[in-house]
């Protein structure tokens, strides 16, 4: 154990542990078995999103114990607490998905309130699913305390008929089943083997994308994102994270010393080169917002456009997170990006060293199977690109990983649906034609409310063999597991009177991922006339409660669908109170 002393006169916990007036507070600590020494050490929040909703977060409570050991080894006092999470895999395809994106804000808010209320000096945050990762990182940057993020790890792939399978295969099997190409018995076998362990979805879906971001942005220890949830090595990363946060307290390194414009650009690079989730286009601007940095969807997409895609991960490729970890993980990917001059090497990390200094320690080379050399990429542009045009003045985003150049332009008639359920019913009934452009509107952050993911619909289309024969645009979102030509985050959203609200069946829509354009063959005068005749936002059933409140506060997808003014308007920093 490393014995060292800290000056508590400038730490937030002095407000609850120091001086005669805090005797009542210390009584509570003694009631929990804390020693005098532990009371007067720095108090470190160990925050998890543990719950029994799904395998994504089920291992976090155990992993938190390793983090606490690390904090104690470095002369800190860990204080474990949990917050909520909504797991997309369970919320998918029904009204529960409206709670998903709102849960990101709830996670950030509740972590902030817990830290503020109990005057914790630093935080180690553990998260394991799509919204809990960005929510936890947002809280760290908002609080601007010494912070270390650690991912709970990915699930192991299942095996069926000698091949790896994931939950993505199950979603797509539903479409095959509806098309009569998959039996009840086959579906039952697949659903039982696809998810064999604890951990988040194994492909480069949203959770693993944001786990890679946590390393690239500098908030997580190098290579800590890769080990699957069941691996014992996760405990070693947990202990190391606990020790690391104590070093950050000692050195005075805070979250905003790490999260800068340059580190956000590094994070966007890792998303692009791994063919990551389009949801990163929502979460990176939201994390930036907490630091007072304007980093828009278009900024993210500009980086995507000139970043090669060279890591062959599902859903666009062949492999899963475990395979990338065994090939060297994020450090090897970052090393390849550095070879191409695509990394800001001077960015600080939670190790106390810069990204460049950490990459100097990496000796593994790209294996050419999972991680290709950057100079022989799978494609010369990122796996995710941004779009703008008269249908999306505030931008949109599309994932093109695994698509060939001849699939990157699509023109077809609009098939307009007012919600996802209507679109899914049309797919089930095969009430659409090859060449259609599905338009699913009223699914934006405010209009949904909640900006649902459309995986049920896109997976069903893929399962019917139509994933490459139709296209889909929405003011909602897509799961990281989505395949096909699917455009999300169309802004302004329908509820705010965006052009997507003015579309009618048969309008000719063009999606051009090569030029970065999303347009409809209507004149400005016609769009204006339709806007004048527009009856206003569709009424929702959410007239009270958390989703009503969220709809009143949430901003557009372009800036991350955030719900408060952000650091640019703050009048104090929590850690300095």
Swiss-Prot record:
The organism's place on the tree of life at top rank: Bacteria
Cofactor mode of binding and number, as noted: Binds 1 [2Fe-2S] cluster per subunit. This cluster acts as a Lewis acid cofactor.
SUPFAM superfamilies the UniProt entry points to: IlvD/EDD N-terminal domain-like, LeuD/IlvD-like
Cofactor(s) the record lists: [2Fe-2S] cluster; Mg(2+)
Gene3D superfamilies: IlvD/EDD C-terminal domain-like
InterPro entries: DHAD_IlvD/Edd (IPR050165), Dihydro-acid_dehy_C (IPR042096), DihydroxyA_deHydtase (IPR004404), DiOHA_6PGluconate_deHydtase_CS (IPR020558), ILV_EDD_C (IPR056740), ILV_EDD_N (IPR000581), IlvD/EDD_N (IPR037237)
Keywords (A to Z) from UniProt: 2Fe-2S, Amino-acid biosynthesis, Branched-chain amino acid biosynthesis, Iron, Iron-sulfur, Lyase, Magnesium, Metal-binding
N6-carboxylysine modifications at: 131
Biased composition (Basic and acidic residues): 1-10
Residues the record lists as binding [2Fe-2S] cluster: 56, 129, 201
Reactions mediated catalytically: (2R)-2,3-dihydroxy-3-methylbutanoate = 3-methyl-2-oxobutanoate + H2O; (2R,3R)-2,3-dihydroxy-3-methylpentanoate = (S)-3-methyl-2-oxopentanoate + H2O
EC number(s) per entry: 4.2.1.9
GO MF: 2 iron, 2 sulfur cluster binding; dihydroxy-acid dehydratase activity; magnesium ion binding
Catalytic residues (positions): 479
Record bears the keyword Iron: yes
Annotated function: Functions in the biosynthesis of branched-chain amino acids. Catalyzes the dehydration of (2R,3R)-2,3-dihydroxy-3-methylpentanoate (2,3-dihydroxy-3-methylvalerate) into 2-oxo-3-methylpentanoate (2-oxo-3-methylvalerate) and of (2R)-2,3-dihydroxy-3-methylbutanoate (2,3-dihydroxyisovalerate) into 2-oxo-3-methylbutanoate (2-oxoisovalerate), the penultimate precursor to L-isoleucine and L-valine, respectively.
Cited NCBIfam families: ilvD, PRK00911.1
Family from the record: Belongs to the IlvD/Edd family.
Description of how the protein assembles with itself and partners: Homodimer.
Protein name per its UniProtKB record: Dihydroxy-acid dehydratase
Gene source species: Dinoroseobacter shibae (strain DSM 16493 / NCIMB 14021 / DFL 12)
